[in-house]
Amino acid sequence: MYKRQVYSEAVGDALAYVVKARVQLLRDLGASNSADSAFSLIQGIETLSLRLERHVQNAQEIAEWLDARDDVAAVWYAGLPTSPWYAAANRYAPRGVGAVLSFELKGGVDAGRALVDSLQLFSHLANIGDVRSLVIHPASTTHSQLTPEEQLTTGVTPGLVRLSVGLENVDDLRSDLAAGFAAARAVTEAGLRAS
């Protein structure tokens, strides 16, 4: 107790001045955005609900389209009535379940790689949540260092493709994916002819 009293008596007013100066400078100059950053932040927040509606709508349409295709073995998207998570999704996310979905492409690793490589609108990235549509084939990219057995243990199958559906026109996205499926089919057929 004595040391604290001596310190405050010795520093006293000077310490108060340092605290006041620091608080005042922080208030006057401190951690604030630049005008451009603040404008961008406001614009982003004001349009967020519209963008999310478009993400969800596009993802739902793409999932339904994929689910109807013969070259797709399965689609994992909680917004589909066939999904085991459909009831929970409707209960917890009644306005839509998001824009990320996965599907199992028939034809394996080579078909998955061919599909991703041939896409023009979808960017080949491991991210999610961008305004642009993104695609990745985990077996040939993010999980390629694992053995096939280890990949299966982590849930990565040879034909697994993950999409993060963006804001583009959904007809353009379907056309891009259709071209990707054609490339995957060509690789699969070439492999069958070779064997």
Predicted regions and their residues:
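Active-site C-terminal subdomain of aminotransferase-like
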Residues: 3-100, 104-116, 121-132
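PLP-dependent enzyme catalytic core of the Aspartate aminotransferase-like
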Residues: 51, 117-118, 133-195
